[in-house]
Each structure stands twice: as C-alpha cells, then as structure tokens.
Amino acid sequence: MHLKYRSFKLHKVVSEEHSKVQRAWSTMAGLPDNAWPLPLEFAPDERSKRRKGAHRPQFAKVWTQPGVTLSRPVAAHVFVNPYSGRKKGDVIAHEVCERLEQANVVTTVHRSNAPGHLVELAREADVPPGAVLLVVGGDGSLSEVITGRFERGSAADDVFGIVPGGTGNSQAHDLAIHSIDDAINTVLGGHVQSLDIGKVVLTEGLPGHEKEPIVRYSHNLVTWGLGVDSTIKAERMRWMGPLRYDVGIVMAILANQRRTAVLEMDGVRLEDDFTLLLIQNSQTGGSRLPLAPGASLDDGSMDIGILKSMTRRQIFRAFGMLKAEGRHVYHPRVDYHRFKTLTITTAKPTAINVDGENLGSTPLELTVLPRAVRLMVPP
C-alpha cells in the first residue's frame, strides 16, 4: 500500500504491547490493517523540570531480560583502532593489556591500520572458547569486529567486550562503561547480556562513489538525512573533538536540503519528504545524544525517530529539545515507531551512517536479529 504521511497524536505510553495498542487504535480510527502505524508516545517524567515546554520523557530500561554470569575469561583478543579518540587507541590498549595480564588473562592484540580493517582482522582471528573479543575504540570499531565475526560464522558463540576509546562511545555510555577501570571490572566480572543486532544491507560508498552492495551488522544506530550530512561535515573537523558534531549539525541545518524517500516498515509503505531518520538499537548516539528514549538493547526490535520535513526554525527547536534529555519526542513534527524490518529507497543514492561511520548509500534493507550476540556488561 502506498501512503502519504498522516500523523495521529494519541496519548499512550511506550510498552511491550505497543503493536496491539496500535492495532486497536487503528480500528477505532477507521484505518485499514495495513495503514502506516500510529506513532508511539511517551509518558512524561513529572519528577523532572519542564524544559523546552515539556518534561523529560520516561526512558525505557536498557535491558528487558536478565543476563547470565560466565566464568572469568581466560584470554582476551584485543582489537584496537589506534586512530580513535584523538589517536589514543594504542595507549589505552597498552594499559588494558597490562592490567588483564596482571589478572592472569592472556592477551592477543589485533591492530587496525585502516578504516574497515578490523572487519578482516576479526574474521580471520582464531578465538578459543573462554576468550573475550575486547574492542578498544568507538561504536564503529565494535561494529567492524561484530561484522567480521558474522562473516566468519562465529558471532553467536563469541563474547564481546568494550573499552571506550572513541569520540562518542554511545554503546559504552548506555552500559555505564565510562573508563578503563569500568571496562576491566566488566571483563573480570563475567556478566553477559544478549544484544539485538541490525543486519544492514546497503551500497558501499557515499553518493558519487557507489560500489557493490555490502552487509554490516549494527549494534548502535543507523541514520539517514540531515544527521548523516552533519557527520560528513563533522568528519572534516575531527580536530575539534566532540564539538564537531554540534558544528556539523548547525551547518547541515542551515543547508536544509530537501530529502524524499520511500520507507517500508514491517511491510507498510510510505513516501514523503523527511528531515532525518534516527534508527536506533541503543538510546544514545553521536556525542552521547539521547536519540531514542524508548530503545532497549534486547527487545527484538529497533526504534526509529522520524523527523518530518521542517523549516530551519523547527529543526533548531527539535534539536534543542533533543539535547534537553530527549524531549524531541514531544515535537509536533517528530514521530516515533518501533519495527523489525525496514527499507529505505530514494530516487538518487543518499548517504547512510552505520554506528557512527559514513559507510554507504541507499537503497537500504535492515532486519533485526533478536539477541544475536553476547556482550559483557557491568553486573
């Protein structure tokens, strides 16, 4: 079914039964079963102060299922992005290896020498049972290692760990792993949760430099539209550190180019002009921005914030609300949904960002793989 966008502002709370609630409301509203689903809305956290005209939304639990505690790892294969975090990856990895060796954990280091190299290193690594694949870097580095293990066919049997060494470190932030100390204690604690993964099929290369289709496995986020434009601009200003994300967003807002796409979400089709699509597995992204307050890492679905076509003034307000603890979900031009499958097609190739890396272009196909990998987390 081909639809133009219709927005229905219904006051309901994000819950595990959201799909049943949506169907019930659709019936009451006289919509067909295959109509574009009604947007989810958030209950306000009335304990918070009102900012930007709204309370902070109630955030979902990061995990919906209990984890398990395994034996302490006997070995760690440490995958290092030396260029992450203002080129501090090697220094962080050296300290991590020293401290793990002191705890009688044998370490093997795999050092990347180019973007995408961690995929190859992870695919080729012989990791024995009882070892952890420990990633020193940011969200993109973890994505590369997970992708490499999927290509090897071993991802379901592996155990992954994170040492925050990138610029944003969104996944580590959501897991409360903020330092080397936190990462070491997490590894030695042996507590593991199962993490949803997004299987992303897209065209390699940014617009104008397209190659063949590739597959990447996303643990954090996928973005299309203004957000990708801003990160492309931000990558040219890496010397600015995290501030580059804010500068990039302002530059992209001022440009405010028109973006038309066809979305198909869980089999329902929609064509419209959009400002930004925020597709999230975790709650934060970029420089730890609260992009998806309703996201959980193991609920078998991913969340999407749809920022519809906006004026520059509306965009600035929406981003101000976003930075104010995720209040953008209350903006009248923002709708929030949850899905298991999603496609994005455009008349011309447009850029896609996966886990903080500008990897390719549309068309895009995304399928959620429920609880597909195991990740070490604080107890």
Where is each model-derived feature located?
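ATP/NTP phosphate-donor binding region
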Residues: 1-136, 143, 147-148
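ATP/nucleoside-binding phosphotransfer catalytic cores, i.e., glycine-rich phosphate-binding loops
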Residues: 25-30, 53, 59-63, 265, ...
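Short glycine-rich anion-binding loops that position phosphate/pyrophosphate groups of nucleotides
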Residues: 84, 138-141, 165-168, 224-226, ...
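Catalytic core of DAGKc-family lipid kinases
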Residues: 103, 112, 150-275
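Short glycine-/acidic-enriched loop or helix-start segments at secondary-structure transitions
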Residues: 144-147, 171-174, 288-289, 316, ...
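Glycine-rich phosphate/pyrophosphate-binding beta-alpha loops
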Residues: 223, 227, 278-293, 358
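Short acidic/glycine-rich loop or secondary-structure boundary segments that cap or lie
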Residues: 227-230, 271-273, 285-288, 312-315
